[in-house]
Amino acid sequence: KKLDSVEQRQLFSAVGQAKLINRYYELFREHGIPVGQVLTTKESFGTRRHYLNQRNCMMVMLENGVIPIVNENDTISVTELMFTDNDELSGMIASMMDMQALIILSNIDGIYNGSPSTPGTQVIREVEQGKDLSDYIQTEKSGFGRGGMLTKTTIARKVADEGITVIIANGKKDHILVDCLLYTSPSPR
């Protein structure tokens, strides 16, 4: 049977989600860290009851030493109500869980004061509250996601306005999460 685009997305999501969570399970297991899967939709943030239920689920997991692996439930998400991308989802989760920090990984080192490919361009180390970054944000997206740096900075600003530290870092660098947690990373805040 020939599938339409929605059916294709649902099929690929259902198959891919199983592979993805198994991969996370194996990676974390190597370090003795238990993980659990939380599939969500944008609608889960729409009512207080669903919001609190989701928050409580993740709190119980964390209190019991289980790391929640949160992902959009693409198999049932309605296109019009989907998250922009995982950056939006991570920002909403960081706010929901009242986190101290949100680390957004990218394929570049952060926000640059020009095009990252231009010689002499540098990463902006720290963004001041309310600073206009529109001249610096590249609108291209990588071939892997729906968002891009524009979405990352939009989400980062919203989350930072709530008092949560936001770091945009290059996820391709070895030990970047440890570096970010130790604040030794060259990534901007």
Predicted regions and their residues:
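Nucleotide/pyrophosphate-binding catalytic subdomain
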Residues: K1-T165, G171-K172
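Short loop/turn hinge sites at secondary-structure boundaries
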Residues: G65, D179-L182
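Structured C-terminal cap/extension of enzyme domains
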Residues: A169-V178, S185
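Conserved small/polar residues in nucleotide/adenosyl-binding loops
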Residues: Y183-R189
